From Swiss-Prot:
Gene Ontology BP annotations: sucrose metabolic process
Location in the cell: Cell inner membrane
Segments on the Periplasmic side according to the record's topology features: 38-48, 99-107, 168-170, 242-260, 309-311, 364-377
Name of this protein: Sucrose permease
Similarity annotation: Belongs to the major facilitator superfamily. Oligosaccharide:H(+) symporter (OHS) (TC 2.A.1.5) family.
Bilayer topology: Multi-pass membrane protein
A Gene Ontology term for the protein's cellular component: plasma membrane
Residues annotated as transmembrane: 17-37, 49-69, 78-98, 108-128, 148-167, 171-190, 221-241, 261-281, 288-308, 312-332, 343-363, 378-398
Residues in compartment: Cytoplasmic: 1-16, 70-77, 129-147, 191-220, 282-287, 333-342, 399-415
Major location category of this protein: membrane
Gene responsible for this protein: cscB
Organism: Escherichia coli
UniProt pathway annotation: Glycan biosynthesis; sucrose metabolism
Length: 415
């Protein structure tokens, strides 16, 4: 299948703008979040693990709400409006509320941060992804070609994040609010009341439809697979790898700056892969594509246990550019092929996002404790071993079903 980027489709442009602005906002602080907490605020590995656990646990509550409500709303925007306000308020919150509280009253800062980040980012990311995926199915373009702009946004944010962070993290936080304001303006332009296809996903969704998903054995196989792979990968990539990489250099500041550059380049590659991989997944099937993504995941984690050369680790980091698009696109296509496509937000947010978050909640603190006592190498060996075991589980138990690809009527290019 030929690569088709539908720039003339106005709905594609809206979906791309949503993704670009959200992810550039997120990357400006999230890509260096662990370094900020540990290097600037002085949190221990145990405190860092506890903070990540509480953040993820709180986001689970919002994910459950977001998934069910957005499936009922179709493509209506109340929840997207909520996200836009969180983006705008991020700068003042981080500077005047979160940072002082973590230093003076860790428990209160922990709780307020978990509520804020869960509502706007950790659950909001899945909400926005599922919202743009609904747009893609309703308005006839591949989700990955729009999501690629989110990766480009993340790359741009990550590139400048390291530069501004080395001057003052507060610059990063204020820029998030600036891009949040632009996100809000884009949301104003997308007039959901004018679209004829808005209710297509939501039509006839009943309580029984949601219950049927949770009774499906295949759903729970999928959840177990996600917990055993994506949860551990997020712990590795978010909590451990940034500090590990920065520590490979003589100066922590130099390592932080180079990590920002590397992260930016990696996400540019990720964006290119995000646009191409949907067509690869259509060819090989979502199960096979998902398993390939997990093989890359295991190799990347294991390589960090075996090598400490910054050049080798930098090359290993770039594997993320293939792995993440493979996993995310495959999850959406696996969900549509195996479950009720009207419930795509519920499946993605509960089956993928909540499942991985539960794993992070349960595993972040033990991983932090293991790191404090044994160091990076032992933790990386342990995580890669578990991911390999779950790869075998997926080979035997994940479904091989595929969605039937149907040619759709083109959508008009203007609103």
């Amino acid at each position: 299948m030929a690569l088709n980027i539908p720039f003339r489709n106005a709905y594609y442009r809206f979906a791309s703008s949503y993704s670009f602005l959200f992810f550039i906002s997120w990357s400006l602080w999230w890509s260096l979040y662990a370094i900020w907490l540990k290097g600037h605020l002085g949190l221990t590995g145990t405190e860092l693990g506890t903070l990540y656990s509480v953040n993820q646990f709180t986001s689970i509550l919002f994910m459950m709400f977001y998934g069910i409500v957005q499936d009922k709303l179709g493509l209506k925007k109340p929840l997207i409006w909520c996200m836009s306000f969180i983006l705008v308020l991020t700068g003042p919150f981080m500077i005047y509320v979160y940072e002082p509280l973590l230093q003076s009253n860790f428990s209160v800062g922990l709780i307020l941060g978990a509520l804020f980040f869960g509502l706007g980012y950790l659950a909001g990311c899945g909400l926005l992804d599922s919202f743009t995926e609904k747009m893609a199915r309703n308005f006839h373009f591949e989700y990955g070609t729009a999501r690629a702009w989110g990766s480009f946004g993340y790359a741009i944010g990550a590139f400048f994040a390291g530069i501004f962070f080395s001057i003052s993290p507060h610059i990063n936080f204020w820029l998030v609010s600036l891009f949040g304001a632009v996100f809000m303006m884009i949301n104003m332009r997308f007039k959901d009341k004018d679209h004829q296809c808005i209710a297509a996903d939501a039509g006839g969704v009943k309580k029984e439809d949601f219950i049927a998903v949770f009774k499906d054995r295949n759903f729970w196989v999928f959840v177990i697979f996600i917990v055993g792979t994506w949860s551990f990968y997020n712990i590795f990539d978010q909590q451990l790898f940034p500090v590990f990489y920065a520590g490979l250099f003589e100066s922590h500041d130099v390592g932080t700056r180079l990590y920002g550059y590397l992260n930016s380049f990696q996400v540019v590659l990720e964006a290119l892969c995000m646009a191409i991989i949907p067509f690869f997944v259509n060819r090989v099937g979502p199960k096979n594509a998902l398993l390939i993504g997990v093989v890359i995941m295991a190799l990347r984690i294991l390589s960090c246990a075996l090598f400490v050369n910054p050049w080798i680790i930098s090359l290993v980091k770039l594997l993320h550019a293939i792995e993440v698009p493979l996993c995310v696109i495959s999850v959406f296509k696996y969900s549509v092929a195996n479950f009720d496509k009207r419930l795509s937000s519920t499946i993605f947010l509960i089956g993928f996002q909540i499942a991985s978050s539960l794993g992070i909640v349960l595993l972040s603190t033990p991983t932090g404790i293991l790191f404090d006592h044994a160091g990076y190498q032992t933790v990386f060996f342990a995580i890669s071993g578990i991911v390999c075991l779950m790869l075998l589980f997926g080979i035997f138990f994940l479904s091989k079903k595929r969605e039937q690809i149907v040619m759709e009527t083109p959508v008009p290019s203007a609103i």
